[in-house]
């Protein structure tokens, strides 16, 4: 398992995705007046002299701008950019291609750090054109991907993901190949492709070094969330429940562990309680928030299906008790999902019984075997007639 002291293996936290998370929190009605979150965000803005970002922030969150602070940060930006331009000019006059590239990279990184998106993109692209080494080119593409994630720029992410894949095919190393999977997985979460996200995250659980995106606990939490909605029960058991790296981290994430194991162990009332906690967490997460309603609905269907698979029929009262909810609630839930074709069962309202009517997989397999057997027999008979002739 990657240890916390391996965090230096990550690329620079530039741009810092934690800032995007804080900005998202402050856009929510329940956190709009949260002084602690606002101060944490503003501390990052002041520390990095993020004048361009601060202007955009005040506009998007409808904040009154601190003109003195903005003026101070702009002055600091101008002075640093002047210094970087002088270093670049000196490198172009007196030094070699490598030093020129380093000076260009330093300017691009600074523009990225202060939140000048367009300036940073232009500077990184110029640096990319000056870069020969494949590894350095990939590092620039990872910068562009982080900028894309920070601003959730879909076009920027998709274009540079393809570019990164192409460069890796040319001979990218093992570390960068695995790093790209984490970036792709994070974007898959953002666009609700949970199945692909689960596949990518599970591939990198034991090799994770992308601390520039998130810490390892957050990564494992995301991995559990997407795996539970995307994987069938046998795969969940092999890849998550029995995953040594995941289990090790889950000891320090009791709520996530309970969420995972309560569903797997069929403790449905505990699972529903855990799902309610997960729902609240997802509402506050900048990547999961647009999808939390979909996610919670699908996980409820998943749990209902898992219970129904074990029975031909059961009472509404038993189901309600199993999930720790009222009979009326379970009746309405099942009726809605049955009408939508998401659950294969029917409700006997008179006797308050739920009867499963899902396709019988064993019966289907038996019929398929008979059908294929008949075809094989016919072919053998035709072949025998040809041989006898």
Swiss-Prot record:
Residue spans making up a coiled coil are: none
Q: Pfam families from the xrefs?
A: PCI, RPN7, RPN7_PSMD6_C
Its Gene Ontology cellular component terms are: proteasome accessory complex
Tagged with keyword S-adenosyl-L-methionine: no
Q: Using the record's annotation, list all stretches that form the PCI domain.
A: 193-361
Record key words, sorted: Proteasome
Classification via InterPro entries:
PCI_dom (IPR000717), Rpn7/CSN1 (IPR019585), Rpn7_N (IPR045135), RPN7_PSMD6_C (IPR049549), TPR-like_helical_dom_sf (IPR011990), WH_DNA-bd_sf (IPR036390)
How would you summarize the oligomeric state and partners of this protein?
Component of the 19S proteasome regulatory particle complex. The 26S proteasome consists of a 20S core particle (CP) and two 19S regulatory subunits (RP). The regulatory particle is made of a lid composed of 9 subunits including PSMD6, a base containing 6 ATPases and few additional components.
Q: Which family does it belong to?
A: Belongs to the proteasome subunit S10 family.
Q: What does this protein do?
A: Component of the 26S proteasome, a multiprotein complex involved in the ATP-dependent degradation of ubiquitinated proteins. This complex plays a key role in the maintenance of protein homeostasis by removing misfolded or damaged proteins, which could impair cellular functions, and by removing proteins whose functions are no longer required. Therefore, the proteasome participates in numerous cellular processes, including cell cycle progression, apoptosis, or DNA damage repair.
Q: What is this protein called?
A: 26S proteasome non-ATPase regulatory subunit 6
* Annotated organism of origin: Mus musculus (Mouse)
- Gene behind the chain: Psmd6
